[in-house]
From Swiss-Prot:
Descriptive protein name: ATP-dependent protease subunit HslV
One biological process term in Gene Ontology: proteolysis involved in protein catabolic process
Stated role: Protease subunit of a proteasome-like degradation complex believed to be a general protein degrading machinery.
Record keyword Protease present: yes
Subcellular location: Cytoplasm
InterPro entries: ATP-dep_Prtase_HsIV_su (IPR022281), Ntn_hydrolases_N (IPR029055), Proteasome_sua/b (IPR001353), Proteasome_suB-type (IPR023333)
Principal location class: cytoplasm
Catalytic activity: ATP-dependent cleavage of peptide bonds with broad specificity
Biological classification of the source: Bacteria, Pseudomonadati, Pseudomonadota, Alphaproteobacteria, Hyphomicrobiales
Length: 175
């Protein structure tokens, strides 16, 4: 699997993810890019789970963003509806984090679209480790990017499905 984290702090939104791709107990690739910009660069998205499934969902989300420009929540809810009700999509095994300047969302195959209470959340095999580390660092003078990187480092030290090859995307946040 992998670990993806989003941190909002100091007028910035940071999404970061590691690069490990595993097949069973074997590391197949260490530098995959699981965090990227979509929707004309205004949205960052990260995924955990089956890679082909995640790319299918990212493509669907991009189409929803074209249909509902500037409305990440609406696009995410529409994607979640399709994901839950479509016979083909229902079998996809992935989870996504998406964020724009104003909102962060976790989208699951169960039809959940969850907005974290403080804009910081994580998914994947090391998600709980990364989230705990990030929350512990929020009251420090570290930037959003420093917190995200350190949280992923901690997760990679604990989770065998997460590595230290980190990709970061940064957006300016509202208010």
């Amino acid at each position: 699997m992998t670990t993806i984290i989003t941190v909002r702090k100091g007028g910035k939104v940071v999404m970061a993810g590691d690069g490990q791709v595993s097949l069973g107990q074997t590391v197949m690739k260490g530098n995959a890019r699981k965090v990227r910009r979509i929707g004309k660069g205004e949205v960052v998205a990260g995924f955990a789970g089956a890679t082909a499934d995640a790319f299918t969902l990212l493509e669907r989300l991009e189409k929803k963003l074209e249909q509902y420009p500037g409305q990440l929540m609406r696009a995410a809810v529409e994607l979640a509806k399709d994901w839950r009700t479509d016979k083909y999509l229902r079998n996809l095994e992935a989870m996504m984090l998406v964020a724009d300047k104003s909102i962060t969302l976790a989208i699951t195959g169960n039809g959940d679209v969850l907005e974290p209470e403080h804009g910081t959340t994580a998914i994947g095999s090391g998600g709980n480790f990364a989230l705990a580390a990030a929350l512990a660092l929020m009251d420090t003078d570290k930037s959003a990017e420093e917190i995200a990187r350190r949280a992923l480092d901690i997760a990679a030290d604990i989770c065998v499905y997460t590595n230290h090859n980190v990709v970061v995307e940064l957006l300016d946040a509202e208010g």
